[in-house]
Swiss-Prot record:
<dbReference type="InterPro" id="IPR013783">
    <property type="entry name" value="Ig-like_fold"/>
</dbReference>
<protein>
    <recommendedName>
        <fullName>Alpha-1,4-glucan:maltose-1-phosphate maltosyltransferase</fullName>
        <ecNumber>2.4.99.16</ecNumber>
    </recommendedName>
</protein>
<feature type="binding site">
    <location>
        <position position="419"/>
    </location>
    <ligand>
        <name>alpha-maltose 1-phosphate</name>
    </ligand>
</feature>
<dbReference type="InterPro" id="IPR049171">
    <property type="entry name" value="GLGE_C"/>
</dbReference>
<feature type="active site" description="Proton donor">
    <location>
        <position position="447"/>
    </location>
</feature>
<dbReference type="GO" id="GO:0030979">
    <property type="term" value="P:alpha-glucan biosynthetic process"/>
</dbReference>
<keyword id="KW-0328">Glycosyltransferase</keyword>
<dbReference type="Pfam" id="PF21702">
    <property type="entry name" value="GLGE_C"/>
</dbReference>
<feature type="binding site">
    <location>
        <position position="348"/>
    </location>
    <ligand>
        <name>alpha-maltose 1-phosphate</name>
    </ligand>
</feature>
<feature type="active site" description="Nucleophile">
    <location>
        <position position="418"/>
    </location>
</feature>
<dbReference type="InterPro" id="IPR026585">
    <property type="entry name" value="GlgE"/>
</dbReference>
<keyword id="KW-0321">Glycogen metabolism</keyword>
<dbReference type="InterPro" id="IPR021828">
    <property type="entry name" value="GlgE_dom_N/S"/>
</dbReference>
<dbReference type="Pfam" id="PF11896">
    <property type="entry name" value="GlgE_dom_N_S"/>
</dbReference>
<comment type="subunit">
    <text>Homodimer.</text>
</comment>
<comment type="similarity">
    <text>Belongs to the glycosyl hydrolase 13 family. GlgE subfamily.</text>
</comment>
<dbReference type="InterPro" id="IPR006047">
    <property type="entry name" value="Glyco_hydro_13_cat_dom"/>
</dbReference>
Length: 701
């Protein structure tokens, strides 16, 4: 049996009698748990082999351990904060037979977790002596060998079947014992082996196999979140911009009450999460003016990310927005409409934040006695003090945890974390574990536009979702590579595809008209289960502060931006109906909840992109064909990879476009014409993928 040999410094894995290798999903050699959500089909694979011609088989062993989140690190130089201790839920493990794939000695299985918490799995390898015996016996019978030559083989088979019978319930043993008796009865080998080779015996042994040399594989973890961790549509809004205008046409500062009045419109578009930038008091020292001016006018509202003033810090709401009770009412109103509120967690301070007065050790002090402000040379951000996590980690860790738990207690279960790559990685591992141990339903979105090593590393450390480079992927080859990467990293990274943010107005939206807004929405909403947009996208807001910049003109980060959504909708200047339809289609099709099953199909036109998805649980299948040209029609031949759809090359079938309602009869090759003046994409309801094909297509390669 394989096991772990513990040395003085290094742990080595000792090979077993049956070798088990290349197990997946395993993240960083098992250091971190893989990710899944309740109801997600999790594919597992492993290489299982032994010497010679002896048959091997594999069993997937799955166990639910409970809701306690795995702690990857302790708080430095201090006790770990006490958390509620609940006894582990003892659940009988699931034993799932694995099947061999196209590659020899590679076995596949899958399981579907049904509750939030930590699940474990391992792959057990074992010798299959009856399969070995049957295979050899059939070959010898086919070669015409007689009773004398097969005497030992027949007796060996009888012994194996008798052994197997001891592991079968008494009421089901008779066929095995009868087959063993026949093998021991002198006579023609074909007659003696007839019972042993029947499908009835084969099916019985599939349920109750005789296992030799059982080797237990290493155990690995899968953390299972609630479904919103994978599938959801996000809408970002500034509550302060919802106050409308006064009689003179000047913007009025919004409140949680005026923001709540916008919630029915947002829910009506099909969004699941309303994300709020920081709602805390804004610093008054070195406050930024409009369009990021270093000098603020007396009426300028400042940037919400410059958190803290004499009015409070991270655990306080801005007095112009209302009270904490008003915030609670806003959260309740969103919940009543079927939405959640996500809150920005920006761990930085304005110079007049209470922390800067009371805890100078949480910042970096310069030789002249001043606190260092944020810089990205040559840029300077005098209105922001970055935190220093090394001077007093115990105190700062505890305070951030207190802040997060404060907002959890007020109904926030999703945090969008600002620039987590600028904070220590062990801090995030500690914080996420502490929070999720108390409430496993709390989720974290990482806003880290940083190189892959850090972006993916944050996902491994526990971040539920991640921002991505989708915004900058605009060509066919870039989008294809990006989509394939979504599937490749699905074991630990869930991208949330935002089409825009208050910081990012990509050039394709600045210069390609309303059609490109629809195109990017289709791509984001259908390539990933999680997608989002920042308020104003539905109004085609596209003016940059200057040519070559991705900053919005009159950026809402620095001023109030009320909008008249109703008038735009009445005048046909709104993408709202199309976004609503997109989110309806997403909810209709479980295929859009999948990360692993995206598959690209060939279109002989670089301005057209085609990809499909299927749901391994139901077989639901969709195919998206989207144009990348916002100004004119594009046509081409679409060549479907029929095997990837569970079909034969000669199949013909009817499909329905979920955007237009039109129906077509399709086959392997199909003429496509997309005119953005009519619709920027086909979203095709395809025939369901057959059950057998689903299992095969979900296998890891």
């Amino acid at each position: 049996m394989s096991g772990r040999a513990i040395g003085t410094e290094t742990e080595w894995w000792v090979p077993g009698r049956v070798e088990i290798d290349d197990v997946a999903p395993v993240v960083s050699c098992g250091v971190y748990p893989a990710k899944a959500v309740v109801g997600e089909v999790v594919p597992v694979s492993a290489a299982v082999w032994r010497e010679g011609h002896e048959a091997v088989a594999a069993t997937l062993v799955v166990r639910y351990l409970g809701v306690r989140y795995p702690h990857l690190t302790d708080r430095p130089r201090a006790r770990v904060l006490p958390t509620p201790s609940e006894p582990q839920q003892r659940v009988k493990p699931l034993l799932i037979p694995m099947t061999s794939g196209q590659e020899p000695f590679v076995f596949h299985g899958q399981f579907t977790p049904d509750r939030v918490g930590l699940w474990t799995f391992r792959v057990d390898g074992w010798g299959d002596p009856i399969h070995t015996w049957r295979h050899g016996l059939i070959a010898k019978l086919d070669a015409g060998q007689g009773e004398t030559e097969l005497s030992n083989d027949l007796l060996v088979g009888a012994v194996l079947l008798e052994r197997a019978a001891t592991g079968v319930p008494r009421g089901l043993r008779d066929p095995l014992l009868a087959a063993a008796a026949a093998l021991r009865t002198p006579g023609d080998p074909v007659t003696r082996t007839a019972l042993a080779l029947t499908p009835e015996i084969e099916e019985l042994l599939a349920d109750y196999p005789l296992r030799d040399l059982v080797t237990r594989g290493e155990q690995f973890g899968v953390w299972v979140d609630r479904p919103l961790a994978r599938f959801g549509a996000w809408y970002e809004m500034f509550p302060r911009s919802t106050g409308g205008w006064d009689d003179d046409g000047n913007p009025v500062h919004g409140t949680f009450a005026t923001a709540a009045a916008e919630l029915p419109r947002i829910a009506g578009m099909g969004f699941d999460v309303v994300y709020l930038p920081p709602i805390h008091p804004i610093g008054k020292v070195h406050r930024k003016g409009r369009n990021n001016s270093p000098t603020a006018a007396p009426t300028d509202v400042g940037s919400p990310w410059a958190i803290g003033s004499d009015e409070g810090g991270h655990d306080t709401v801005h007095p112009s927005l209302g009270t904490i009770d008003d915030f609670d009412d806003f959260v309740s109103a969103a919940r009543d409409l079927g939405m959640e509120v996500a809150l920005d967690l920006a761990l930085q301070c304005a110079p007049d934040h209470p922390w800067a007065r009371e805890h100078r050790q949480w910042f970096t002090e310069l030789p002249d006695g001043t606190i260092a402000y944020a810089e990205n040379p040559p840029k300077k951000y005098q209105d922001i003090y970055p935190l220093n996590f090394d001077n007093d980690p115990e105190g700062l860790y505890d305070e951030v945890l207190r802040v997060v738990q404060h907002w959890v207690n007020h109904g926030v279960k999703f945090f969008r974390v600002d620039n987590p790559h600028t904070k220590p990685p062990n801090f995030w591992a500690w914080l996420i574990a502490q929070v999720k141990t108390v409430d496993p339903d709390v989720l974290f979105l990482s806003e880290a536009f940083t190189p892959p090593a850090r972006q993916y590393g944050l996902a491994k450390l526990g971040f539920t979702q991640s921002y991505s480079y989708f915004t900058w992927r605009t060509t066919k080859w870039e989008l294809t590579e990006f989509g394939n990467q979504i599937a490749e990293l699905a074991d630990y990274r869930r991208p949330n595809l935002f089409v825009n943010t208050p910081d990012i107005l990509h050039a394709v939206l600045q210069h390609n008209g309303p059609g490109m807004f629809a195109i990017r929405a289709v791509l984001a909403a259908t390539m990933s289960p999680a997608w989002g947009m920042y308020c104003g996208y539905e109004l085609f807001e596209h003016r940059a502060v200057r040519e070559g910049s991705e900053e919005y003109l009159d950026s809402e980060k620095y001023e109030l931006r009320p909008r008249d959504f109703a008038s735009a909708l009445d005048q046909g200047r709104s993408l709202q109906p199309f976004i609503t339809r997109l989110n309806i289609i997403r909810r209709l099709h479980p295929a859009f909840q999948q990360l692993r099953t995206i598959h690209f199909h060939h279109v002989d036109n670089d301005a057209l992109l085609a990809y499909s998805k299927f749901d391994p649980a139901t077989g639901d299948c969709v195919l998206v064909v989207v144009t990348l040209n916002a100004f004119g029609p594009e046509e081409a031949t679409l060549w479907l990879d029929m095997a990837a759809l569970g079909m034969e090359d000669y199949d013909r079938f009817w499909v329905r476009d979920e955007i237009t309602g039109e129906e077509y009869q399709w086959g392997q090759a199909n003429y496509i014409r997309i005119d953005p003046a009519r619709a920027v994409a086909h979203i095709i309801n395809m025939p369901a993928v057959p059950y057998e094909s689903r299992n095969t297509l979900l296998r890891r390669r």
